[in-house]
Amino acid sequence: MLYDQIATNKRRTGYVMFGFGVLTLAIGAALGYLFWNSWVSGTVIAAVVAVVYMLIMISQSTNVVMSMNHAREIKDVSQAPQLWHLIEDMALVAQVPMPRVFIIDDPSPNAFATGNDPKHAAVAVTTGIMERLNREELEGVIGHEMSHVRNYDIRLQTIALALSAAIGLLVNFASNWFWWGGATRRRDDRDDSAGNIIGLVISIFLIILAPLAASIAQMALSRNREYLADASSVELTRNPQGLINALRKIDDSQPMKAADPNSAALYISDPFKHKQKFADLFATHPPIADRIARLEKM
């Protein structure tokens, strides 16, 4: 059951990332057709923009994310011995280097991992999670976060964020061009054949829906990786009950005050406790009840 869940979630993640890439290139193609009458030119530009954004995000992600969430780094074991030793032990079990350790001064229990790869990873926990969870429960949470590190979820989330930002930049460029009449001038140079009209309609349709589709894809990726990290945490700790109890306590808590909205998908549970009508599409995390139900079957 455990390894089946891990394999299933990895496949789903592959589908989502493939969809992200296709969407980015499709937006580029649409822009190229609208403004330069060339699908290829736009696709190349979109690919370059996406790669540049990814490189910037990957190189700066840890410091930026920790700053946005008001996290302070713990550089010595004496500052938080229990937390330090738990992370050290889980890193050893997961066979990854010891990550940087951060604490967020917030009474709501929560935690997240970020970074580029296991060698440049960081784990942050709130003061609330250290106060409310016992050792067994905290071990389950740290196992979850170290699973994100081991499974390269931290890089996947960074890439997804970069692709979303690239799509937003391209769409913003298109909107400004339309506003100043650039696209109108380009269309004046074309004939009004059925093929050109269909191409224009498809391109405009893609540009309008792209940000929504990117958001849905990013949320789907986050949900799939949460399920995978839960299963991987059990693989590391051999104790599903610890994580189950931790999730129940985290769910039964107040929203965070220190969390940054752009980092919500990184946390082990939605830090703002959003109640979405269309949760399956726009929620950053799967329902806690569903996660617990899966853990109870292990």
From Swiss-Prot:
One of its GO terms (biological process) is proteolysis. The keyword Coiled coil does not apply. Its EC number is 3.4.24.-. The active site is at residue 145. InterPro entries: HtpX_protease (IPR050083), Pept_M48_protease_HtpX (IPR022919), Peptidase_M48 (IPR001915). Pfam families: Peptidase_M48 (PF01435). Binds 1 zinc ion per subunit. It is a multi-pass membrane protein. It is found in: Cell membrane. It comes from the Bacteria. Gene3D superfamilies: Metalloproteases ('zincins'), catalytic domain. It is an enzyme of class 3 (hydrolase). Belongs to the peptidase M48B family. This is Protease HtpX homolog.
